[in-house]
Amino acid sequence: MSAMTGTACVPHAPRLTPAWTYRPGPDVAHSPPPGLVEAQSLAKAAAMAALAFAAPGVTEREVELAGSDHLSAAGVEHVWTITNVGVGSNTHICFPTHPPTDLAIAKRDVVMVDIHPITPAGFWGDCTRCRVIGDYPEAVSALRDLEALHYETLEKCRPGMPANELFGLSAQRLMPEGFELLDLLANIGHSLTPGAAYLHNFIDAGNETPMWGAWAVEPFAARDGIAVKVEDLVWFGRDTCQIL
């Protein structure tokens, strides 16, 4: 009974708090939350499972379902935005308004999968991988070179660096190697906070936001008409950066 109101006290459920306590700025955690690491590991595995299903004649929607099956088997019930699958001309578009279609994989093709699971614990993952189908040496070369410059750029990440500086490091490699940035918003990634992407905007030429916590880095580019993309999460910790 409440002494002030004279009404009976109703027991409350435990206070609800986010699975990932967000601490922006230099007081961010040294290491990424284990749940975030798990979510990204699952995203990478699901992307690879989807690509493993890819073969000539298989449609974008069927590739998407292969990725969804992998997520469902891991207990995932939701994604935070659609799974993007691109083959043929559709590899040149990767955007939330462009869902998988009935376009089938050709004998020589590139298959792109961008997947975004939410784990049962509430953590978000974000991963893009590509696979070359058939005898397509130009595509193999484009994908290999993009992945190489991507990971070399990630090695230059440092805690608190401005987003536009990371963009510049990537851009100064893309153009000399013959790549044209394809992202519709002219960026190479975005922030990823608990329950929200893009809260700190994008990794682009105009964003001076210091990078702390999780950011998705995803160069999406074409060379000689062949579109390729790769994406990883980076944890910008208090003292070091870690590729998840």
Language-model-detected regions and their locations in the chain:
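Active-site neighborhoods and metal-handling regions in enzymes and metal-associated proteins
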Residues: 2-244
